[in-house]
Amino acid sequence: ELIVIYRQEILKDIRLFTSQPVAKFYDSLFLNLDLSFVPEFPKTGRKGFSNHAMICSFIVMKCEGFSMISDLVDYLHNNLLIAHFCGFDISRPLPSYWTFDRFLKNFDNKVLSKIMKTQVLFLSKEGIVDTSFIGLDSTPVSANTSQNNPKSFLSNKFKPGNQPRADSDCRLGVHTASNQTNEKKYEFYWGYKNHVLVDCISGLPIYEMTTTAEVHDATVALDILAATHSFQPITDCIFLADKGYDVKNIYNQVKELYNGECIIPLNKRNTKNPKLLPQGNPICVRRAPFPQNADHSIISPATMKE
């Protein structure tokens, strides 16, 4: 009888089913997450689950690297302490798969953007992030469609007119399939792009924008910088990016609007050979010839554009 009672007490202690470092991480994370501007419950209709708890649950999903909502549901049921830290009443049933799915579909992305902005301002105030050295890049986000399945051998799956039925908003894009600079390997995909501006010192994101996959990186760079500058000044910054951002407008605006500098590799596809005088001297953008013994390597990539 004592053994049965002992086993029951063990089952009641939810702390025994979650490692203490993980529990401490989520406890600290959610204590420092400001969701005060998000209504916790709807003003009318059924009360349902707390919006704050649902948001925290999806943060757990990303931190744990889950790609499926079903994995999140299983994790919360097996780690009730984490569910408690999210804000759920663990004495009652937790949200089902369909509750999470419906919340995600109806959730306004503007709320996430405001949460991120609030956290960035808090981290800046604490001296954890700053904008003196920033970098911008994009990453592909594949749509959940069979046309992205590598096992699909349909010849027309990446034709622009063959829009996936499962996702009418996604678009056809291309991304590099290798990190080697001397290897030109590309892959097509249906989906989106996530453009992220980061603090290169701390490695933490400062701003993000999601677009459809066909949008070129350089076309949204200035919008991202302007949006960031509106709440977190980027004056006197050093802007780091890859050759996809080697565009004259970016050099000019970073210099003129933010008094910053760009570190961007030369995109050879956007350059041309400089005009030469009969003596062989290159002519600069201001139509003046370089001296015979000048170091021609100082020519800015931006000045060699069409």
Show which residues each predicted segment covers:
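Charged, often Cys/His-bearing segments associated with DNA-binding zinc-finger transcription factors
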Residues: 1-33
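Short, Lys/Arg-enriched N-terminal segment that forms or immediately precedes the first helix
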Residues: 32-46
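Outer-membrane beta-barrel domain signature
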Residues: 46-47, 183
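Glycine- and acidic
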Residues: 39-41, 53, 58, 207
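Helix-centered, glycine/charged polyanion-binding patches within enzymatic domains
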Residues: 249-306
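Polybasic low-complexity intrinsically disordered regions
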Residues: 97-259, 263-267
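Short, positively charged, Gly/Tyr-enriched micro-motifs
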Residues: 47-115, 225
